[in-house]
Amino acid sequence: MVFVWLTAFFLVVALIVLVIYQLMCLADLEFDYINPFDSSSRINKVVIPEFVLQAALSVLFLLSGHWAMFLLSAPMVYYNYTLYQRRQHLVDVTEIFNHLGREKKRRLFKIVGLIILLFLSLFWMIWTVLLEEDE
């Protein structure tokens, strides 16, 4: 059971790193350190891996029977799926300045949700280690 929590912890850390990378690219664009083409291509390269990691995390929670954690991570997967279906998951080079605020808010909300998942995963990992140590 510790393996599940350890895997979840590393998946959440990887997701946080990907979203922070996207936020850094948007901040660099906002302060004019990078051009729109480079910024959007860098962000678009990590969007699909982020979606796949988030789905893998939810499947891990589902298959391991951690329903509460699955229910906490499922809305983010659904949100990612809806973005993908509407073809709004990629950043458009020509519209990136118009949607800069919205894109930053979207990623900040993701960071908040992922940090909550990170702390919960860390808590349950420690709890599981302590329970297995008593047995």
UniProtKB/Swiss-Prot annotation:
UniProt keywords, alphabetically: Endoplasmic reticulum, Golgi apparatus, Membrane, Transmembrane, Transmembrane helix
Membrane topology qualifier: Multi-pass membrane protein
Regions that span the bilayer: 2-22, 51-71, 111-131
GO cellular component, one term: Golgi membrane
Record GO biological process: vesicle-mediated transport
GO molecular function: cargo receptor activity; signaling receptor binding
Signal sequence range: none
InterPro entries assigned to the protein according to its UniProt record, in alphabetical order: Cornichon
Domain of life: Eukaryota
Keyword Endoplasmic reticulum: yes
Subcellular compartments: Endoplasmic reticulum membrane; Golgi apparatus membrane
Coiled coil: none
Keyword Transmembrane helix: yes
Similarity-based family: Belongs to the cornichon family.
UniProt subunit comment: Interacts with HKT1;3.
Entry function: Acts as a cargo receptor necessary for the transportation of the cation transporter HKT1;3 and possibly other secretory proteins from the endoplasmic reticulum (ER) in COPII-coated vesicles targeted to the Golgi apparatus.
Protein name: Protein cornichon homolog 1
Originating organism: Oryza sativa subsp. japonica
